[in-house]
C-alpha cells in the first residue's frame, strides 16, 4: 500500500502520508462522507471529491497489479519470461504500456502470420527484416516446399509475419499514438439510404461532419456514437497526415535499398492499413468514448446533486396535483409528514370541462385539510391547472408551486410505490410523489432510480457501471450532507446514510415500528446487526429532534460529546446552555481542547455546529410564475423576455422551462456578458432566470434563448 500511496501522491500532487491515512481509513470500512467530515486531522482536510479520486486511483492500481500477475504467469507458461522482461513488467504501472509489452506473447486466434509460421516461413521473415541479403531469389527458393506453392507464396507469408511484428512493435504503436494524439480527425458520414428517413433527422448535423478529435466535445462524440449504434452514421478516426505516418514507420524499419528492404516496405504498408491503424483507431475510439463518458457522468452527477439539494418546503400540509386533460387531474391531500389523507379526481379542463365543480372541490379540500401549499406536476395540462388553481379564492394563504414530474411515473409503477400504497393506483401514487417532492425533494427522489430523473446528458449511452457508481456516490453525499431524521426517514433514505445500507436501514425501520421513536443515538446500538463500526459511521449523520441530549440532533459525532461536555463544564453551564447562548460560545478557547487525535479542524466544526445545530444546508424555497401569455410554441416571438426555470445543464449550455411543452436552449456563449467555459459556474438546476427569445425553429421545435444583458 505504501508504494501505491507514493504513486497516487505524485499523480494527485498531495502529501503521501495523507494518501496513506486515507487509504487506511477506506480499507478499514470508513465511508467517504465519514472520512471527509470526521477525520480531517488524518487526511489534512481532504474533501469528498479528493477522497473519491484516491479511492478510484487505488482501485485502478489494484486492477493493474492483478493484470500484471496474469501477464507474468501467461508468459512464464510459454517459457519466454526472461529476467529482463520480468523486470520490465514489474516496473510498469501504465495499462497501455503493459498491454504493448504483452502483445507479442498474447494468445491469438488464427492469424495470417500464424499460418505463415506453421508453413516454416519465420526464418525468411527474419532474413527480410535484416535487409542484408543481395541474392534474395535464391534464398526464397529454399522455402518453396510443403504447403508453400511458389516464391511469391513464400514472400507473401513472410510479409504477413513481418506485418504482425511491425504492428506489435512498441515503437510502432507509440509512434502511431503520438500521431493520433496530435492530429487525429473524427469523421462521420450518413449511411447510404438513411438520409431520407424521418428517424435520422436528429443526426442531420452529422451527415457530413469532420473535426479534430481533441476538439470534439463530449456531447458531440456521444451523439456520433449513438448515431453509429443506430445505423445512421459511419464514424471513423484517422490521422490527418497518413503519409507522414508511413514515412515515420519507414524510418523505423527500412534500413537499406535492396530487394529485402522493398519487401519490408510492402509489409509495412500492409501492417499500417490492416493491423496498426485499425488497432490504434479502436484504442482512440475507446479512449475518447471513455473521456466523453466521464464528462457526461460528471455533468449528470452535478445536475443530480443540485436537484437533490433543491430547497424543501418543509413540514407543511400539501395538496399534490398530477394534471391532465382526458383523464382529468388527480388530487391528493398530505399532512405535514407526507401521509396521504385524501385523494380524488377533478376535470376542470376539456374534454369534460367541469370547471365549477372542480373549483368547489379544490376550495373545499384546502379548507377541510388546512392545506398550506399546492404542488402541480409540470407535465401535460400543467399551465392550465396552475391558472385554474391560482384563480380560486381560499380561506387562507396558499402558495402554488410547479414541480418537476421527471421519474414520477416510474416511481408510481415501482415496487417501492406499491409497498407504500398497495391499495391505490399509479395516478394516486404519482400525485403523492409530486406533493412530497415539494416538501422534501431529497427524501422523495432517493426512491427513484437516479437515471430516470431526467437531468443527464446521453445517460443511456455511457458506461452504466460507472454511471451508477457516480450517481450512488452523489446521492450518498447529499443525504449525509443534509442529515437524516432517524424517526421519520424512509428505508430508502436511510439506505444512503454512511455505514448503513439496505439491511440496516430496514432493521432501523422495523425497530422503530416495534419500539416507537428513538430517544437517543445510543439506542441505535440496540438495532439488530448494528455493530460498533456501523454505529461509528452512521451516528453523526442521524438526527433525533426530540432527544434529551441536544447533541443528538446535531452533526457533532458521539465520539466528540465528551469534548463539548468539557467545554460546558469549564464555563459552568449545560450543553443546552452552550447551544442557546452565543456569548458563552464566544468564550471557548479551542486550543485548550486540542489532543493527539482531535485538532483544530474538528474543534472548529464542533463550534460551528453548536452555533446552528442540525442546520439544513439547502436554500429557502421561492414561489415562481411563468408568463401568463405564453402557452404554446406559437405564442413565442423573437425578442420576448420571459421568466424560466433551469431544468438541465450540459457542457454546451442549459435548458430552460419557459412554461410550454418545449424547453429552450441557452447556449454557453449566451449565458452571460462574459466568457463562460463551464455552464455550471453560472447556473444551477431549478434556478429562476430571465431569458430572451433569440430564434424559433417551428419545424424542429427548437428555441434558442439568451441570458445576456438580463441581470440574472
Segments from the language model and where they lie:
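C-terminal accessory/binding modules appended to enzymatic or scaffolding proteins
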Residues: 13-14, 311-313, 476-510, 628-666, ...
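Accessory alpha-helical DNA-binding modules that contact the DNA backbone or grooves
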Residues: 31-32, 47-114, 119-149, 342, ...
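Short, ordered loop/turn segments at secondary-structure junctions
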Residues: 38-40, 129, 240, 323, ...
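Duplex nucleic acid-engaging cores and interfaces of nucleic-acid transaction enzymes
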Residues: 50-53, 64-74, 78-320, 326-412, ...
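Long, charge-rich intrinsically disordered scaffolds of nucleic-acid metabolism proteins
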Residues: 97, 401, 407, 412-482, ...
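Low-complexity, acidic/Ser/Thr- and charged residue-rich accessory regions of DNA metabolism proteins
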Residues: 142-151, 209-210, 243-276, 280, ...
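A glycine-rich phosphate-binding loop feature that marks nucleotide/adenosyl-phosphate handling sites
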Residues: 178-185, 321-325, 379-384, 403-410, ...
